[in-house]
Design a protein with these regions (language model features):
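Extracytosolic low-complexity repeat regions of secreted or lipid-anchored proteins
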Residues: 46, 144-156, 161-169
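Surface-exposed, charged secondary-structure patches
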Residues: 109-155
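A mature extracytoplasmic/lumenal domain signature
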Residues: 103-105, 140, 149-153, 166, ...
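Core segments of small alpha/beta cavity-forming domains
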Residues: 40-120
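Short beta-strand edge/turn micro-motifs at domain boundaries
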Residues: 28-39, 159-192
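Amphipathic, hydrophobic N-terminal targeting peptides for secretion and organelle import
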Residues: 1-42, 193
Length: 193
């Protein structure tokens, strides 16, 4: 009688463990499926930059380029555009953010995106220089990094490539923020991946 009770209890425990494993595994599969259906805009706008800020100047520019690619090549709602501009402004240094208030920045992005659309220009690909090509300097006690990026554009049946240099400054928390950026000429030092 005791042996039968122990066998039944053991079978019940094994069934409970198997059932728990199935439930946990099924929930994680569902969570993974939900993640897979997020658009690039949603992946960027749901990224918590307060907890997961990019660690290097290169990663900051890569994230900014993902945002730029969304601006000029994807469909988004006005609320998503607000969220995209919020994320971009979090990457900006205080000086750049002060010179680009959210409403002004959003209007500029909207006008540029419309201009690209009117001219049938698409941003086909972006690239950022290798980690070894990032230049670091110290200026008036501030750590500064220079990161080159490339933009492969398609207009009708023709293609062009432009280059920009991003200047980033490390803030008091150690985060790299975009201080400014400008168009540069292509040369052998500008090759990006």
């Amino acid at each position: 009688m005791k042996k039968t009770g122990i066998v039944i209890l053991t079978i019940a425990l094994i069934a409970a463990i198997c059932g728990s494993f199935y439930v946990v595994n099924d929930k994680s599969k569902r969570a993974n499926q939900k993640e897979k259906v997020l658009t690039e805009v949603q992946r960027i706008t749901t990224k918590d930059l307060d907890k997961n800020y990019p660690q290097t100047p290169r990663e900051v520019v890569k994230l900014y380029n993902r945002i730029v690619k969304c601006y000029y090549g994807m469909q988004y709602s006005d609320e998503e555009l607000d969220a995209l501009t919020d994320q971009a402004l979090k990457l900006f240094d205080d000086e750049l953010a002060a010179n680009n208030p959210k409403d002004t920045y959003k209007q500029s992005v909207t006008a540029d995106a419309q201009s690209y659309k009117d001219k049938a220009v698409t941003l086909a690909q972006t690239g950022v220089c290798d980690s070894n090509d990032v230049k670091y300097v110290t200026d008036n006690g501030s750590k500064i990094a220079y990161v080159n990026a490339s933009y492969f554009m398609k207009e009708g049946s023709s293609y062009s490539k432009t280059y920009q240099e991003y200047v980033l400054r490390q803030d008091k928390e150690g985060c790299w923020r975009i201080l400014t950026f400008y168009k540069i000429a292509a040369d052998s030092d500008t090759e990006t991946e």
